[in-house]
Swiss-Prot record:
Entry binding sites for S-adenosyl-L-methionine: G48, W50, D68, D86, D111
Gene: rlmE
Name of the protein in its database record: Ribosomal RNA large subunit methyltransferase E
This protein's record includes keyword 4Fe-4S: no
Catalytic activity: uridine(2552) in 23S rRNA + S-adenosyl-L-methionine = 2'-O-methyluridine(2552) in 23S rRNA + S-adenosyl-L-homocysteine + H(+)
Catalytic machinery residues: K151 (proton acceptor)
Pfam family for this entry, one: FtsJ
Amino acid sequence: MSGKDEYYNKSKQQGYRARSAYKLKQIDEEANLFERGDTVVDLGAAPGGWLQVAAEEVGESGTVVGVDLQRIDDLDDHDVETIRGDMTEERTRHYLREAIGERGADVVISDMAPNMTGEYALDHARSVHLARQAFDVAEELLAPGGDFVVKVFQGEDLDAFREDVRAEFEYLRTVSPPASRDSSSEVYLVAKGLNTAPVAAGDRIEVTVEERGDEGDGIAYVEGYSIFVSDADVGETVTVEVVDAKPRFGFATRVDVGTPDSDESDEGE
């Protein structure tokens, strides 16, 4: 039995609207995308197979919203909201923002593919274009630390797109789920931990230490973002170098303190 028949038949038996549901299941198994209570946005969601999987994984306490130019039939067994519209239009994005709330989405997923022409270079270019559109929407909708999954066809423009995504997230991997057809050039970029920090590693900034952390480090804030500063006391204003910037907090070391050599030299005089 071919891979296509296997997953097609399985989807019919288990009540999924599309065989692609198993791709998302396999990606989730590998990358741990979903948690109970998550808010998920599915871009290009018709016919709804990925919506079904997402709704199962986030449970009744979660929120799942799908958007597509095509109408998506109601999902009787799942509490899913669907929006018919173009995700690149501000009107549709407004509806999406209203649906997910001010906190934003925990996960944005996209299984979109262009209408195939049979001309590989053209199909690849269109695929990357769709993926970039999904990336733009994901950056707008995701909460800090959120995750992004997008399908794209392999080709000459993939590496540049992959690096653009990598620059905005803590971690990126490329996944080829077993449910993909052997003849397909599709891969999925799985990006974890959207980094919206107002600082980056290597930045030198002046901060005021406002609190002390559990491990003894000072804590300063930049636009509400927490930076742990070693060897600094509460109330000190110090110049620091950021050594690591994670989505919700970062680490920095002081660069305004004297060196041991200079201290010894002063004592010698």
